[in-house]
Amino acid sequence: MAHTSAGGLRLHTQRLPGRGDGPTVVFLHGLVMDNLSSFYCTLAGPVSRAGHPVLLYDQRGHGRSERPPDGYDRDTAVADLTALLAALGLDRRPVHLVGNSYGGVLALHTALRRPDLVASLVLIDAQLTGDWVEDMTDTLSVAALGLEDSRLPEQLAALGRRKEARLAAGADALLNRTTLIEDLASATAFTARDFARLECPVLAVYGAHSELLPGARELARAAPDCELCVLPGVGHTVLNEATEGLCAAVLTRLGARAGAVAG
């Protein structure tokens, strides 16, 4: 287990080697009940074995990273990532960003704010357009009340479900003892104008039954260079339910980018 000090914040990181000196692939996990392990157990290994160096990290307040009381807005997330790349010496060339769900939101925001840092984007069923900010804020507010009024972490621990107990305790701390919900509520959805400003290639991988697919189609229409890959038979949880198809799409895209750079 490694920690890296980035902009005064201790972030839990994990690196996997690649071959050669190609761009690093940085994975950004989802919100609240997630951490770097979701990628470590799915895409990170195959991507590393294909020759691409990998960086995973627990975002601010998640997993084994430090949990400050505030700073959960998108601009601060970009600053955290920028500081992390600098601390690891990975800011000298653009990196590939792979974001799942809200991690995709942060990856896209990074590409818009710091296009010099991003070689390409892979967005996995990320929330892009529509009323997702309000919907997610409402959902998390209800969850916060439920966690505050229950003893779920203790009950799970008593049943021997230690991993679930840790996740529940972390979610309780994030939702009830930080500004995460307030910071999320201040965000706005992306627009076609935002998509048109993207300077890097984008691969968007979505489930055929996902409620977020319309936003991905809008992205594909508006972005200068975007491939939309729709995986059949799954909804939002593409990373876990369609790992094989997702992995194939990601490796194909990374291989194509490596070939383009080499050529």
Say what each PLM segment does:
Residues 202-234:
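Conserved loop-alpha-helix segment in the C-terminal half of the alpha/beta-hydrolase fold
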Residues 55-98, 248:
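Active-site loop/oxyanion-hole signature of alpha/beta-hydrolase fold enzymes
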